[in-house]
Swiss-Prot record:
Top-rank lineage group of the source organism: Bacteria
Gene designation: luxS
E.C. number: 4.4.1.21
Source organism of the structure: Leuconostoc mesenteroides subsp. mesenteroides (strain ATCC 8293 / DSM 20343 / BCRC 11652 / CCM 1803 / JCM 6124 / NCDO 523 / NBRC 100496 / NCIMB 8023 / NCTC 12954 / NRRL B-1118 / 37Y)
Binding of Fe cation, residues: 56, 60, 125
Protein name: S-ribosylhomocysteine lyase
InterPro entries (UniProt xref): LuxS_sf, Metalloenz_LuxS/M16, S-ribosylhomocysteinase
A biological-process GO annotation: quorum sensing
MF annotations from Gene Ontology: iron ion binding; S-ribosylhomocysteine lyase activity
Physiological role: Involved in the synthesis of autoinducer 2 (AI-2) which is secreted by bacteria and is used to communicate both the cell density and the metabolic potential of the environment. The regulation of gene expression in response to changes in cell density is called quorum sensing. Catalyzes the transformation of S-ribosylhomocysteine (RHC) to homocysteine (HC) and 4,5-dihydroxy-2,3-pentadione (DPD).
Length: 158
């Protein structure tokens, strides 16, 4: 058993109120610079989760659409529990800024502007058969209807 303390394992998942964005941590690099890890929680932990096709499609859509809105995004990786994403950035944004960005991106996803899943071919995706644009759009609608909070424990909808 590892002795390393993993922040997400110390988070009381029964106390958070999804959807939200929160800063998990900012780490300084050994040669300067820093990266920040965010918790983009889209569904309430232990109550519901996004099926893999919808989550996988959101991942592909976020990859381009979020980077179109802000600089410094290194990676967006889905949580294994399928309730949201880690968002890694070399820019230290506050939670409210990122919540507004994800609201805007989700609004684009539900619009008629998004009609296909980017990079959903065998050459560009490791599981190209597991996508659902319909599911991604439906989840985006649900998340927008609930509102995205800039605080994990108190609803501060942006």
């Amino acid at each position: 058993m590892s002795e390393t303390v993993v922040e997400s394992f110390t988070l009381d998942h029964t106390k958070v109120k999804a959807p939200y964005v929160r800063v998990i941590e900012t780490q300084a690099g050994p040669n300067g610079g820093s990266i920040t890890n965010y918790d983009l929680r889209l569904t309430q932990p232990n109550e519901t989760s996004i099926e893999t096709g919808g989550l996988h499609t959101l991942e592909h859509l976020f990859a381009g659409l979020v980077r179109d809105e802000i600089d410094g995004i290194i990676d967006m990786s889905p949580f294994g529990c399928r309730t949201g994403f880690h968002v890694i950035s070399w820019v230290n944004y506050d939670s409210e800024t990122l919540a507004k960005v994800f609201k805007k991106v989700l609004e684009k996803i539900v619009s008629d502007e998004v009609t296909e899943v980017p990079a959903a071919e065998i050459e560009s995706c490791g599981n190209y058969k597991d996508h659902s644009l319909h599911s991604a759009k439906e989840w985006a609608k649900i998340i927008l209807a609930q509102g995205i909070s800039s605080d994990a424990f108190e609803r501060k909808i942006v």
